[in-house]
A protein has these predicted regions:
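Single conserved hydrophobic/aromatic residue that forms the stacking wall/gate
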Residues: 1-4, 8-11
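Flexible helix-coil transition and linker loops at the boundaries of alpha-helical arrays
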Residues: 10-13, 34
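TPR/TPR-like alpha-solenoid helical repeat scaffolds
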Residues: 14-17, 50-58, 82-84, 104-125
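Alpha-helical adaptor scaffolds
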Residues: 18-29, 33-86
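Non-membrane alpha-helical secondary structure
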Residues: 25, 32, 101, 107-111
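TPR/TPR-like (Sel1-like) alpha-helical repeat modules
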Residues: 41-46, 69-70, 83-107, 123
Length: 131
């Protein structure tokens, strides 16, 4: 989930929108990750992490997300990155935490190719099977 371009203000005195940032978000939405990253690199925010993650720069993405505010979304993305990096226990812990914050993450993880294997392997969210 992208952070909207309206969230980034270039000049705190005039509240002038950062049009370059808006362009980068547009690139992300169009899956033009290299172009997005060129603009986003200095921001070091969630969208920068999404661009890194989409290009396979998992350690860079994880570094940024670990320093970001811990929401269900950021913890979910960290779970994916940890799974990619072979840190299964950390991935499971982050996924469970994300699901505690937002129940929709359980459903999402079952459909996610990078996390559904961990869900099955560790028997996560079994109580969801009851209904």
């Amino acid at each position: 989930r992208l952070v909207g371009s309206e969230m980034c203000i270039r000049d705190s005195y005039t509240n002038e929108p950062d049009t370059m940032y808006a362009r980068a978000v547009d690139y992300l939405e169009k899956r033009k990750y290299e172009q997005a990253l060129e603009i986003l690199r200095p921001y070091e925010d969630v969208n920068t992490a999404i661009a890194y993650m989409s290009l396979g720069y998992d350690k860079a993405a994880l570094r940024i997300l670990e320093q970001s505010s811990q929401t269900a979304e950021t913890q979910y993305m960290q779970a994916i990155l940890n799974a990619r990096l072979g840190n299964e226990q950390r991935a499971v812990s982050l996924l469970l935490s994300a699901a505690e914050m937002d129940d929709r993450m359980r459903f999402r993880a079952n459909l996610d190719p990078e996390l559904s294997l961990l869900v099955k392997k560790y028997g996560l969210f079994k109580e969801d099977d009851l209904w």
